[in-house]
Amino acid sequence: MTPPADLVRMVTDRRRTAPIDRDFSSWAGQHYGPAASRAAANLLGVVTYDADPGRLSAAFVWERLLRVTAPRPPAVRYVIGGWSSVIARLATRAREMGVVIETGARVDQLPDPPVLVATELTAAQRLLADATLLWDSGRSVLLDLGVTARGGDAFAVVDLDEAGFLERYSSPDPTLAPAGHSLVQAQMPLRFGESKADGLRRLERLVELGIPGWRRRTTWRRDAVATGRTGALDLPGRTWRDRPAISRGDGVFLAGDMVAAPGLLGEVSINSAIQAARGAVQAAGIREDREPVNR
């Protein structure tokens, strides 16, 4: 199915800038009409994990809309083995450099500075005893499925009506599922006051469109709700610069996807981590090594 013509007209108007202090729905409706505004907002529900992206800052939504509809090969890279393989490589490299990694240990106080705190804001609030560590984020129901493979299953589905999304990740990386099976992951932003069960029912209807007969083919299933764990959302009048600062003072630095750093989704975490690490190195009085790192 092709996207609405009004939406196509909108995303090809790439030289326009959007205001920070207006909501996206009213701004986009004024320039492109209500149909395009609704379709664009629902498309952006996929990358904001929010059921009503139209309420967000027009500049925030517009930047992301232009990113995800850019007329060039997508920036997505599928790493063989998934994120767990990336984390394993990072951990191995860190240990090679002398980093001591402890897992399964509860952290209830900060060590001597300089220190980097890389966690979601609710946990950072408690650890830093700082109630100002707040920002808006999404709320979405998640569904992971293992199904028997069948020809004709969709690789990806974007729901322009309800902002849902589905992707069959074992298509580009067959190592994610046993032979003859597929790994499917889907998400649906929850509406205000909507229960997990109601959100799952809407999401399951989307799954049926992309993976017909999935219920009788399912060999493994899990579901969850992600609340405040899907990145920062900027309301009208706010930008990434208004989010909680990376440098908290006294040698404490905060990194994550809801702090004052630019980027889309995981890019915020990466950019904030680089800035926080540089700040910590400087606070420790260590000369920063700018030599390129072997990859």
Question: Which positions does each model-derived feature cover?
Answer:
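Alpha-helical scaffold segments in soluble metabolic enzymes
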Residues: 27, 43, 89, 275, ...
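A structural signal for the hydrophobic beta-strands that form the central parallel beta-sheet
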Residues: 101-103, 117, 254
